[in-house]
Amino acid sequence: MQLNPHRAGRVWMLGGLILFLAGLGRAADVRVVGSDLLGLEFSQALYACAVREGIPLAVALDGSRPGYDQLASGRADLGLLTLPAGENPDPAGFTAVPLAWHRVVVIVAAATPLDRVTLADLAAVFGTDVPVSYNRWGDLGLRGEWEGRPVTALAAAQGAGLSEQIFRHLILQDRPLKSPLGRYTSAADLAFRLEGDGRVLALAAALPPQVAGLKLLPVAVRAEDPAFSPTPENLQSGDYPLRLALRVVFRRTAALRVLPVVRFILSEEVARVLERAELVPAPRSVRRQHALALEKP
């Protein structure tokens, strides 16, 4: 019997954890919880770090909200949480460090003569129950042969990542996307649709890799504001608005025990893992600054 990849990953992690704890002969010293979108590679990297450091480690990446509950109740020491700004643990009892960013990018064909969009534009293209609805490129300011062309709006298949949830929360106040709406099932499917239809305007977590002829549109909060691209620096500063932080959160009382793990999580090795999971790590200088600050007594 063959396991599917997700189940095989869970079995691998559980087996590795049992062997690691049994070899050390004691219960886990550091209990890590949080986002279920980080992937098997991230968990493997954490266990490899724990072996190097000699730290008994238990990892349960079952979701940010369950992780929050476990941190708040004292059943976990360290969390990797993606939560709206007002829902992070009390700073009096926890330290929170931004590690990376989930982002929503806006993609069009490179030949599309549009060089920026605003949040209101995106709401009008993708939203329901909004003051105005956009269906043609002329609504976005294009003229000439583009003015009457329909916009083909695309979003990821429901349940695929966080891009739709982030967009709905930040732009539509949690209202649903309009229906009917085109949906893509993978990065390859998105690339195929963008290459085959120059009228597409798509929301995604990242630009499909190794695909020419596409571009990311800078986003402005309002029409009179400058537009920003989704670079690490613009995500960190908040200039690019379509983003949600992945934070490392740990109990202050557990700071000494979790420090080696936190130091590793802020490393370049983990940054590369996060990139492969379609997150944008905080700039290296920012992560290094946080790591140095945590070393101080």
Placement of each model-derived feature along the sequence:
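Flexible loop/hinge segments at secondary-structure junctions
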Residues: 28-297
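Sec/Tat signal peptide C-region and signal peptidase I cleavage site
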Residues: 23-27
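Bacterial N-terminal signal peptides that target proteins for export
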Residues: 2-13
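Bacterial N-terminal signal peptides
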Residues: 12-22
